[in-house]
Amino acid sequence: NVTIPYKKEIMDQLDFISDESRKIGAVNTISLENGKLYGYNTDYYGFGLMLDISKIEVKDKRAVVLGTGGAAKAVVTYLQDKGVKELFVVSRNKMKNNWSGEVNLIDYSDLQSLEGDLLINTTPVGMYPNVGKSPVGENVIKRFEAIVDLIYNPRETELLRLAKLNGKKSCDGLYMLVGQAVKAQEIWQDMNIDNKVTNIIYEELNGEFN
């Protein structure tokens, strides 16, 4: 596995880069296959698993992504690949647009009047130990159908608490964490891992965090 700050730099050393990694511009998993180095981004697959399990639809939806870091790039790439209708990325510096494809870069003041189907937090706001904070207020949350927070500690962030309070469909990032790790094992072992195994790992970690 590869972590920050080497996810981008390592790409020049690889013989093969997967499609999702090339689009994202980062690799987090490397496999040695027949003497060649292959790079993948399993965050992409982990995010997809999380949405599938939570029954959150992407195709033809209007989505807003909070944050512009590495996780945001994986999320944006997945949304684009799965046919999102309209996509907004919220940044504190909307003049710096490094996004490919149809991405609308806006700032937090623009968000106050925006409505959509899916709101995804990729920022660390609300993560342990700085709990009790939300990247957006209820006035924003009320204008979306589903709220996703990639944070998994705490299990219920302030953002998710407010989402549930307003009757919104919501999910945290624990299944993404598990899903990306399982995908890495599938690559290394060259095998498909049954979803039952993924669920067992999830339940084990769920018990640890609760």
Positions of PLM-derived features:
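Conserved S-adenosyl-L-methionine
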Residues: D81-E86, L165-K169
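Adenosine-phosphate binding glycine-rich loop
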Residues: L150-N210
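Glycine-rich Rossmann-fold phosphate-binding loop(s) that bind the pyrophosphate
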Residues: G67-G69
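Rossmann-like adenosine-cofactor binding region
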Residues: G101-S170
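Phosphate/diphosphate ligand-binding glycine-rich loop within oxidoreductases
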Residues: N1-S54, E156
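Short helix-loop-beta connector
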Residues: E33, I56-R62, K142-R143
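N-terminal Rossmann-fold NAD(P) dinucleotide-binding loop
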Residues: A72-K73, E156
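NAD(P)-binding Rossmann-fold cofactor-contacting core
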Residues: K82-G101
